[in-house]
Amino acid sequence: GSLKARMCVRGKELLYEYCENYRVPCERIGKIIVATSPRQFETLRDYQRTAKANGAGELSWLSQGDVEKLEPAVFCRAGVLSPSTGIIDSHSFMLSLLGDLEAHNGVISYLTEVSAINTSSGITVRCDGFELAPRVLVNSTGLDAVALSPVTEPEDRGYFAKGHYYVLSGMSPFNRLVYPVAEEGGLGVHVTLDLAHQTRFGPDVVWTDGPDYTFETSNLDRFIDAIRRYYPDLDSTRLHTGYTGIRPKLGPADARTSDFVINGPEQTGVSGYVDLLGIESP
């Protein structure tokens, strides 16, 4: 019943519909979540129960042999299959959204920094050398959302979890997304594929004091160990640095996983003002 769960389920339906209507490339390739030891079986059962309760559909139980037939390169003791999980050409999707916006007389102001939001008398947005007074404002600034919000408490702060991705050169050994059982702070180092079926592994979780996109190659051995738990035949010479991304968190490393926070005018106390906080995943 969390916002993350509800938006994942409904968002998936809307996104597939949008891709079909606007011819945005996507592919339902499915996802397998794997347990590499019997100790993790109950976690997979929990995933099945949670998926059903959230309306995400059935996660099919897979034996070790079932997984070997679907993904010969993957080692596990059991798994669950989400057949409706897919991948999308995110660049084409963003261009399509831009076209939608401009078709409805919307304008994007590129290279314009928002430095402050004031709601003491209406809504005022301070930008580079000028101010705007919108009737409606949605603060969806991701990493800066908590700091920019004029209605959060002084003690509130955002936290930053950096994740690294490594790219696997050559032909992909996988046909689907492959996820290990989740770990603290994230979903674990998993397999992602793009529409060209290039393989990426990631992300890990590195807590930082602020936005820092430096790629730290000192984590390579940890990546290799994590990947080989479910892909034992990994040739580490095929791993190359990819990129980093940062997830905005609402709590520190030792905090329980937090939900998305969407505060509309009723919660913010400001007519026309909406805060989107801790939106760490699209």
Provide a role label for each language-model segment.
Residues T214-P282:
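C-terminal catalytic lobe of FAD-dependent flavoproteins
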Residues R39-T43, L70-R77, N118-T124, L132, ...:
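A short, glycine/Asx- and small/polar-enriched loop/turn
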Residues V80-V136:
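Helical element adjacent to the flavin cofactor pocket in flavoenzyme catalytic cores
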Residues C26-I29, E155-A161, D233-G245:
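A short coil-to-beta-strand element that immediately follows conserved catalytic motifs
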Residues R28, S63-Q64, Y110-T112, C127, ...:
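Short loop/edge segments at beta-strand edges and connector loops
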